[in-house]
Amino acid sequence: MSPSPTRLTVRSVDPLKTPNLTSRAPVRPSRKSKWAETTAHLQRKPCHSRSNSPAWEISGPPWSSLDHLDPIRHQSLQPSDFGARTPTGAHPGLGAYSPPPEEAMPFEFNEPAQEDRCQPPLQVPDLAPGGPEAWVSRALPAEPGNLGFENTGFREDYSPPPEESVPFQLDGEEFGGDSPPPDSASHATNRHWRFEFPTVAVPSTLCLRPARTRLPSGSRAPLADHARLSDLLTSHTTFPQWRSPDPCLRLAEPPLGSTTTPLSIWTAPQSQVMARPSKSREPQLRASTQRDPHLSDKQPRQETALSAAPLQRRQKSPPSSEEKDPPPNLKQCISSQLLLRSPERTLPKPIRTQLHTQFFRSVLRKSEESQPCPPIFRLLLKMRAQMSGQNQTEGQPQPPLPSPKTTENQPPPPPPSQPPSQPLSQPPSQPPSQPPSQLPRQSLTPKPSLPPGQSPTPKRSPQPRQPLPRRRSLPPGQPPSPLRSPLPGLSLLPEPIQPPGLSLEPQRCQPLLGQPPLEQPMQVLWSGEPGHSRLLQPLGHPSLPAQQLPPEQPLLPAQSLPAGQPLPPQAGPILDPPARRSRLLTRLLRGLLRGRVPGLTNTNVAEAAAGMRLRPASARSSPPAMSRKKGPLAASSGFCGETAALASPGATQSGATRSATSSPEPSEAASVYLSVPDHDPSAPGRPRILWKRGANRCAKKPWRCESRSAQIRNAASSSTSNWRRRRWTTCVHTACCF
């Protein structure tokens, strides 16, 4: 690859070697040359890959070789013009080689002196197409000593500009207008270097105009082309306007290399009109109107205007086809109604109600005679008649229709021609934000305004209803209570199954609907226990009425019996606070997997379910021989022990009461944990954890000898265990719970 035009080098050239424009290294080792020559390695063919680059557009077209010149310029470069020739027509010193016309131009600085003649200089100011004319002078001076700077290599009618005459630098010296005077030391140095010419220094034989990106000789300011090229390569405006698809990145900082827009202006909210639409699929943050400060200021005004617009539409809306103007007789009756306003305030309410009813009936008759009455007045008349008849039968005072405020400047009330969507009985002072479900819709008569000192009278419903008791606010996880029964203290429905967030046990202090809340827990008796037909009295409420149940009527689980008689000491247990259902279910499954649920021999499914729902505090509290994670060492769990105690007829009532009520007093029944073990209770249980023996004995680290599945398999294969029966019982308990 040939060097670019801007990388012209100065090196010595062997005069005996054939000039090759493309070779860099010599073919054979040449002798050391006496002359330092300048050689410009020109391009044979232009590089097409560089012709499209912006650098070539600024600096001009690529340099061309001599074969690109015009025919007129070729005529001035004939071989006969370059000094003496040998008889064969070749240059002296080139041997028998005769170069072609395009290579006949010598690129050496000058040839060796032949007799008294010298090689005429060759001047090519610019080889680029469209540049100054390239020519070779044919005039030879008479003597070599008379060579002058003014006539060397120049035509008589042409004077090149100073920047085109001597563009190159040889040995650090510059030729041209800024060259030193002939008497200076540098000029003497050049004279010694140019020992061939005892006269002045001659400029280069081949003068080429440099590239436009090269700085001129002796000038420190860059050319306009050079500045334009540097701007083209370094300016951020030529970069493609890349935009990140992420709107967060576009709002975070300006583009890379941007120096025009500061960060504060870039991150400022821009209006939707000024923002450039993006083609990305992600939501655009600039498209929202909330980022525009001008639009955000106008938003509350728009909201108020929108809220006020429906009211204006309702006031300005024309009447519908059904709600035409009332007949003239009706207008007269309405105007005559104003006469009844003054005595209304002095008359009692029943009389006022009768007057209103008679008035509307008369209006209806007169309007039917002249014109059919609108359906709104018929409905109004029926409602008023029902209200007046009910008030007379019940003897309750009926509130009158509020009369409008009578003032001198106030016009008569408008006729009932408003849209049916807006209730006419709505007072003007009522805020429009009140939900429509709370608006009274009983009467459709125009409700006039009240005087300043009078409070509005609440209207009653058309049909009297019994007042329903207000619902009590229950805690977040508590289900609603069952429906109230006709009997004041008895609930006919069993307690519903509670959601998974709660326990399966009955609530301790959950009174029925309509009963006062109990300060203390209520005592409950379960079916199957002695004394279940006795009366129970809630503690702290001796004044509640007693209700006797027949002995043959079974008592459902979780059913309370308030009673008026004192309770004997051997009554049923007191319920404890409920446990979480998740914990109870976990223990059920754990006992099912371990096979430690004892079977029930003489119990049915209902009693088993009743026993499952009871879980005293003694069952939740771990006995001394119970592991924290793996339950008691005996083959029973707490809730199953209580089930066995309730099912076995031999268990003492006092022991069951004490164990169920978590009595701190020691008892024999509590010490044996109220369970019927299948194996010998005196036999020590097999330890589950064996201590390591050896050097690590002092560390007291537990080491399990076998897995849990092996223990279950061994327990099932033992002769003294009823593991399958206990597992079936546990499945029955679990099914009853759900």
From Swiss-Prot:
Its main location: membrane. One of its GO terms (cellular component) is cytosol. It comes from the Eukaryota. Residues 410-438, 448-467, 476-485 have a biased composition (Pro residues). It is found in: Cell membrane; Cell projection, Ruffle. GO terms for biological process: adenylate cyclase-activating adrenergic receptor signaling pathway; adenylate cyclase-activating dopamine receptor signaling pathway; adenylate cyclase-activating G protein-coupled receptor signaling pathway; adenylate cyclase-activating serotonin receptor signaling pathway; bone development; cartilage development; cellular response to glucagon stimulus; cognition. Residues 257-273, 387-396 have a biased composition (Polar residues). Residues 1-105, 155-188, 237-350, 387-516, 528-578, 611-689 are annotated as: Disordered. GO terms for molecular function: adenylate cyclase activator activity; adenylate cyclase regulator activity; alpha-tubulin binding; beta-2 adrenergic receptor binding; corticotropin-releasing hormone receptor 1 binding; D1 dopamine receptor binding; G protein activity; G-protein alpha-subunit binding. Keywords: Cell membrane, Cell projection, Membrane. It is a peripheral membrane protein. Residues 279-301 have a biased composition (Basic and acidic residues). Residues 542-564, 615-626, 656-671 have a biased composition (Low complexity). May inhibit the adenylyl cyclase-stimulating activity of guanine nucleotide-binding protein G(s) subunit alpha which is produced from the same locus in a different open reading frame. Interacts with the N-terminal region of the XLas isoforms of guanine nucleotide-binding protein G(s) subunit alpha. This protein is produced by a bicistronic gene which also produces the guanine nucleotide-binding protein G(s) subunit alpha from an overlapping reading frame. Belongs to the ALEX family. This is Protein ALEX. The lineage of its organism: Eukaryota, Metazoa, Chordata, Craniata, Vertebrata.
